[in-house]
Curated annotation (Swiss-Prot):
Protein name (Swiss-Prot/TrEMBL): Putative transposon Ty5-1 protein YCL075W
Assigned keywords, A-Z: Transposable element
Source organism: Saccharomyces cerevisiae (strain ATCC 204508 / S288c) (Baker's yeast)
InterPro entries in the record: PolX-like_BBD
Domain of life: Eukaryota
Gene: TY5B
Pfam families assigned to the protein according to its UniProt record, in alphabetical order: Pol_BBD
Length: 146
């Protein structure tokens, strides 16, 4: 059994991370947490290692995993590798080298609700060509499904 510490709290306000990794880039990027409204962090720790300990006594070697996410306040041209994504997704129609508008009403569903998929096509990222990329104009980031 594992205990999840910090589910759904903001990374930039995480006292455990601030104590353990005070120089982390996230604290410099969002010092007042005004723009990282969708940031969150969770740490899964075996419960037998946490008996009688406070969050401040838990060390990184005890962590099973750390999950984090940050949705930027504005759209980004960066591409993020996403192991939970079912297909490649892009919010910028102008970078599609081929495109077919969707005639169906498909939606991307996630924690934040659902947003429409407006079409699909091919996107070139440098020398890499991604096929069957979904065009999702309301998506804040571009995602590569892995």
């Amino acid at each position: 059994m594992y205990i999840i510490y910090g589910a759904d709290h903001r990374i930039s306000n995480c006292s455990l991370l601030k104590r353990r990794i005070p120089e982390a880039r996230i604290f410099k990027l969002y010092p007042n947490d005004k723009t990282s409204r969708s940031s969150s962090a969770s740490v899964a720790i075996p419960d037998y290692e946490t008996q009688g300990q406070t969050a401040g006594q838990i060390t990184p070697k005890s962590w099973l995993c750390m999950l984090s996410s940050t949705v930027p306040a504005t759209k980004s041209s960066e591409w993020i590798f996403d192991t939970g994504c079912t297909s490649h997704m892009c919010h910028d129609r102008s970078i599609f080298s081929s495109f077919t508008r969707s005639s169906r009403k498909d939606f991307v569903r996630g924690v934040g609700g659902s947003i429409p998929i407006m079409g699909s096509g091919t996107v070139n990222i440098g020398t890499v060509q991604l096929h069957d990329v979904s065009y999702v104009p309301d998506l804040p980031v571009n995602l590569i499904s892995v």
